Regions:
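Outer membrane beta-barrel
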Residues: 24-39, 63-203, 232-236, 370
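Gram-negative bacterial Sec-dependent N-terminal signal peptides
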Residues: 1-22
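Outer-membrane beta-barrel "beta-signal"
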Residues: 386-402
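Extracellular loop and loop/strand-boundary signature of outer-membrane beta-barrel proteins
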Residues: 66-70, 171, 213-217, 250, ...
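Detector for outer-membrane/organellar transmembrane beta-barrel domains
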Residues: 222-224, 228-354, 365-367
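Transmembrane beta-strands of outer-membrane beta-barrel proteins
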Residues: 27-35, 91, 95-99, 131, ...
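Gram-negative outer-membrane beta-barrel proteins
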Residues: 37-45, 103-109, 139-143, 204-208, ...
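Hydrophobic, lipid-facing positions within transmembrane beta-strands of outer-membrane proteins
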Residues: 77-81, 118-124, 180-184, 225-229, ...
């Protein structure tokens, strides 16, 4: 046997274990493209007067405000692609991973947040539960599907996280619905319908200060961190959820925030042999520590999902209270401001219709009725407005999953 044949034989032997492992590994390319055409209205800021971080160009000068007529735009709504996979390790243990990136499907531009800008992690799974490390949403976000429109797959300005959890805002501005890097998460296996989730995100100096996505690496010196925990029950027609999140010095030094959400949903259609008619509700309390004192806000919402003509009709009403606490009037964190007329109501109705298992059409209308001193706006593809504006939007969209 010549040297070349020996080398080939040795290479084949060396690669054999890798080939065997590859046969046990499963890797899937997946994603979704969600595009819609929108008509949005609302009083917005003059171009010469840029809005501050909370999307509110305040001030009594009328020159800083424009009454904006209807604006037509095409938007990409959480479009994404990714790779996910698993490898069986033996003895019931599985290695799991996922790498997911945002896609600007309306312009074709790459995401400014980087390649792994969405749910990205590696971990282990077994009959003891699931552990993973990376970047992902917190257990607090898992409350949203109980009352929100996430199950109808109509993610857009129709997002029901516009007011709940200050959804449009990152941690550095007081949001509680952010995707967090530098995270460790454990999920229990289901036990008689019960599950629990615990996540810790460290914001210590593992990156450039005050940079990154969603407030990532908020400070190199103050050791900011996030704890998020959730407990859930799902059995038959009933779903319950309780979540709590504590943000330590995420906005600035010596100021801590925390939030509590309780949600429930019940498929009342199952009582009549026609499942799918689902009612949901949520209560939330946000608490912010400020230099001037405490600031709190309550939020309630009720929703209904009704199966109609092969699709799903979804309706929701939510109300944010005025900002309260011992901080003086005018104290604000994000959209939450202490004082009278700082609350809002959010109304929404939408209909989604599946053309197939992977393609969905949807249409809807959303409106946020801000009181005189409030400036809440849409969650996804937000729209900068002035205090007291009532932003609204009509959408027609299509989503394809692959």
């Amino acid at each position: 046997m010549n040297a070349k044949r020996v080398a080939v034989a040795l290479a084949a032997i060396a690669c054999a274990p890798l080939a065997a492992q590859a046969q046990l590994a499963k890797v899937t390319l997946y994603g979704s493209l969600n595009l819609d055409v929108e008509w949005v209205t609302g009083a917005t800021c003059a171009s010469a007067v840029p809005p501050p971080a909370n999307n509110n160009c305040s001030g009594s000068d009328p020159a800083s405000q424009i009454s904006n007529p209807t604006v037509m735009r095409v938007s990409s709504n959480s479009s994404r692609f990714g790779l996910r996979g698993s490898e069986y390790l033996g003895a019931g243990q599985v290695a799991i991973f996922q790498l997911e990136s945002s896609v600007q499907a309306d312009t074709g531009n790459s995401s400014s947040s980087g390649l792994a800008s969405r749910e990205t992690f590696v971990g282990l799974q077994g009959d003891w539960g699931t552990f993973k490390a990376g970047k992902f949403l917190t257990p607090y976000d898992d409350i949203l599907p109980l009352f929100g429109n996430a199950p109808t797959l109509t993610t857009s300005i129709l997002s029901t996280a516009a007011v709940w959890a200050q959804g449009p805002l990152p941690k550095s501005l007081g949001g509680f619905d952010a995707r967090l890097g530098n995270s460790l998460r454990y999920e229990t296996p289901p036990l008689n319908g019960f599950t629990a989730e615990l996540q810790f995100s460290t914001r210590d100096s593992s990156g450039n200060a005050n940079g990154g996505d969603n407030g990532d690496h908020a400070s190199e010196t103050r050791h900011a961190s996030v704890w998020s925990v959730g407990a859930f029950y799902s059995n038959g027609p009933l779903d319950l959820g309780l979540a709590y999140e504590y943000n330590r010095q995420m906005r600035t030094a010596d100021q801590n925030d925390h939030a509590l959400s309780i949600a429930a949903a019940y498929d009342i259609g199952s009582l009549f042999g026609s499942p799918g008619l689902r009612l949901g509700g949520v209560y939330e309390r946000l608490n912010y520590g400020t230099l001037a004192g405490s600031l709190t806000r309550d939020f309630w919402a009720l929703s209904a999902t009704v199966p109609i003509a092969g699709g799903s009709l979804y309706a929701m009403w939510g109300r944010a209270s005025n900002g309260k606490g011992d901080a003086p009037d005018g104290t604000g964190v994000g959209f939450v401001v202490k004082g009278p007329d700082t609350g809002c109501d959010q109304w929404e109705i939408s209909y989604s219709y599946p053309l197939s298992l992977r393609t969905l059409l949807y249409a809807g209308y959303v409106r946020i009725n801000n009181r005189a001193n409030a400036a809440y706006t849409f969650n996804i593809n937000d729209y900068s407005i002035v205090n007291g504006a009532r932003p609204s939007g009509t959408v027609f969209g299509i989503t394809h999953f692959f």
